[in-house]
Design a protein with these regions (language model features):
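Loop-to-transmembrane helix boundary motifs in multi-pass membrane proteins
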Residues: 15-23, 92, 133-137, 224-226, ...
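TM-loop-TM module centered on a large, flexible mid-protein loop between adjacent transmembrane helices
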Residues: 84, 91, 122-127, 232-305, ...
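C-terminal membrane-solvent junction of multi-pass transporters and transport-like membrane proteins
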Residues: 157, 193, 331-335, 372-429, ...
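Hydrophobic alpha-helical segments and their helix-loop junctions in multi-pass secondary transporters
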Residues: 124, 163-190, 248-258, 372-390, ...
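Membrane-interface "cap" regions at the ends of multi-pass membrane proteins
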Residues: 1-70, 74-80, 89, 187, ...
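Transmembrane helix-boundary motif of multi-pass solute transporters/channels
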Residues: 17-119, 207, 213-216, 493-511, ...
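Membrane-interface loop-to-helix entry segments
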Residues: 118, 132-182, 193, 233-237, ...
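Hydrophobic transmembrane alpha-helices that form the core helical bundles
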Residues: 41-44, 63-140, 144-148, 153, ...
Length: 567
């Protein structure tokens, strides 16, 4: 085959026959891969509140996001997931923002899992700094090779790792329930905490523990029958929830009264803290602490494996739409996988796995919450683009509950994301908002340099020759700046009350810039006002000089056929 005949981009991807079970286990790895992380909630929120949050969040957070993903994925089972859905709803500017937020967040955090693995391994085997570097490189290389084989192999590895993790936490549940010792819900909250304190301390961790369902959609273009993804979502969600709730109840019930204050992510691994491993070491012997430490390593490997598969497709799809450097669109001849995206993610992971993650993760948190907000709004718009009746005629998945269901499924992620943004801390919000500004800046550069959607469909996506952007982009940028200013200005009132007047936070309560928080809040106030004013001016100018083109009447058959797996 000649170089010219080799197809790159989404059209050249190899499709795999992935069963529902494969999707379920990949989702399990993307979202949970065990209950590790919940340990930090227990002393911060209290045993009772932790269990309430773990039980409520599947209903008000995981179930809505799963349904949003299932409905959009059924309508548009395309590589790129949320990016494609937002692009079809609101155009390439907002689509790029969604793609940028989702992809950059994966590039930022994938190194966390490598660092956690090396930390766990060093508890088993004392290692020098050089040995740790070798271990990091070895881990990244192994899962890079697996990903280069394709998502079918990723799914097989995910299945094996998921089964091991589920069995381990099932054992924790069984042993804990058989050795019930105390009430798992007492106390409801830590002493001196009220309801707001308790919920505020746990909500961000709970959001983190139940996020990731949308990531599977990034690989939909490589699944022969992508309609298995909505089915997998509905099965994976309760499995994840049970893997969190049951072991946590069992652990709190079997460990001594008062030990809930000592829970930590490294608990039970030969130190003074406790955790899920302690349930086994206390009742079955110390050897089980080492066995469970291996499970913790497996868990982080499982997450890393699936996030490498999902995250490596982000820039690949943007490049296919001429919104990213074109070399990212290349795929391998034999396997039909986006090898440049996989290798680039591996390189960035190695570099960042040796860094301090505090600032990077603070940016990632805001990116993910922004992504859920815009996904919810896009679903509302797409309901108008392709009505429910048209979808049902074609046997596509539609969220239950009619209009009330739509309100529930879209409002819950928006409200919870907004709350999580404002209780995570001024330091995290500031770095996250600064990171968010990179989206429009990078879009302007890439759109002007590579042409965007107008390269392949100039009639549908015309370019304004004076700005070299899409018609209406100036107006959209104005909206972005206005929203950024509104969040900043309104948020500072809440943060000033929640953290200072009510909470009495000191500089030690912040992970970053604690001594500068009063000054940052002043900056929020005036910068927010400036951004609001600038956004209004830019919107007014854009509406007058760069008005968005009117929406076309949708040809439902063409729209659905465009993303049909059988096209």
């Amino acid at each position: 085959m000649s170089q010219q005949s080799h197809v790159h981009g989404v059209a050249g991807l190899k499709k795999h026959d992935i069963k529902v079970s494969g999707i379920v286990f990949m989702l399990y790895c993307l979202v949970g891969a065990g209950a590790f992380g919940i340990e930090e909630m227990i002393p911060e929120s209290g045993p009772g509140m932790t269990l309430i949050l773990l039980t409520v969040f599947p209903v008000v957070w995981a179930y809505p996001i799963s349904n949003l993903t299932a409905e959009c994925g059924s309508l548009m089972p395309s590589e790129g997931g949320v990016y494609v859905w937002v692009k079809e709803a609101f155009g390439e500017f907002w689509g790029f923002q969604a793609g940028w937020w989702g992809t950059v967040s994966t590039y930022i955090t994938n190194g966390v899992y490598v660092t956690l693995v090396t930390g766990y391994v060093s508890q088993l085997i004392p290692m020098s700094e050089i040995s740790l570097h070798v271990l990091r490189i070895g881990m990244v290389l192994i899962f890079t090779v697996i990903n280069l084989f394709g998502i079918k192999e990723v799914g097989k590895v995910s299945t094996v790792l998921s089964v091991l993790i589920v069995l381990a936490f099932a054992l924790v549940s069984i042993v804990g329930f058989m050795n019930w010792n105390t009430s798992p819900v007492e106390p409801m909250m830590p002493e001196g905490y009220n309801l707001l304190d308790s919920i505020g301390n746990g909500i961000c961790i709970c959001v983190w523990m139940y996020c990731g369902y949308e990531c599977i959609s990034n690989m939909a273009g490589e699944v022969k029958n992508p309609q298995v993804i909505p089915k997998g979502l509905m099965i994976a969600m309760p499995i994840v929830a049970l893997t969190y709730i049951l072991p946590t109840i069992a652990g709190l019930a079997t460990l001594p009264s008062g030990s809930w204050m000592d829970w930590a992510t490294d608990g039970g691994f030969g130190n003074e803290t406790v955790g899920y491993a302690t349930v086994l070491t206390q009742n079955l012997g110390n050897i089980w602490g080492y066995i469970f430490l291996l499970v913790a390593i497996v868990s982080q490997c499982a997450i890393f494996n699936t996030y490498m598969a999902s995250g490596s497709r982000g820039f690949f799809v943007l490049a296919d739409d001429n919104l990213c450097p074109r070399f990212m669109v290349r795929i391998s001849r034999k396997r039909g996988v986006p090898y440049v995206g996989i290798i680039s993610l591996a390189i960035v992971t190695l570099l960042l796995s040796q860094s301090d993650f505090t600032t990077l993760v603070s940016i990632e948190v805001v990116f993910i919450l922004d992504l859920y907000i815009i996904l919810s709004i896009a679903v509302i718009k797409l309901r108008k683009t392709v009505p429910v009746d048209e979808r049902k005629k074609r046997g596509l998945y539609v969220m239950p509950g009619g209009k009330l269901g739509l309100i529930f499924f879209t409002s819950c992620p928006i409200l919870i994301s907004a709350v999580a943004l404002l209780v995570n801390g001024t330091d995290y919000l500031m770095t996250g908002l600064i990171g968010t500004v990179t989206g429009p800046l990078v879009y302007i550069v890439f759109k002007r340099k590579y042409g965007g959607l107008s390269v392949d469909e100039p009639g549908r996506y015309p370019v304004n020759t004076s700005t070299k952007l899409a018609f209406g982009d100036i107006f959209r940028i104005g909206i972005f700046i206005f929203l950024l200013g509104s969040v900043t200005f309104i948020g500072q009132f809440w943060l000033r009350w929640y953290e200072i007047d009510y909470g009495g936070w000191t500089s030690s309560d912040y992970d970053m810039m604690g001594e500068f928080i009063p000054q940052i809040l002043v900056i929020f106030k005036w910068a927010g006002l400036c951004f609001i004013a600038a956004g209004i001016c830019i919107m007014a100018y854009g509406y007058k000089k760069d008005r968005p083109s009117s929406e076309e009447i949708v040809d439902y058959d063409y729209f659905i056929e465009k993303y049909s797996v059988n096209k």
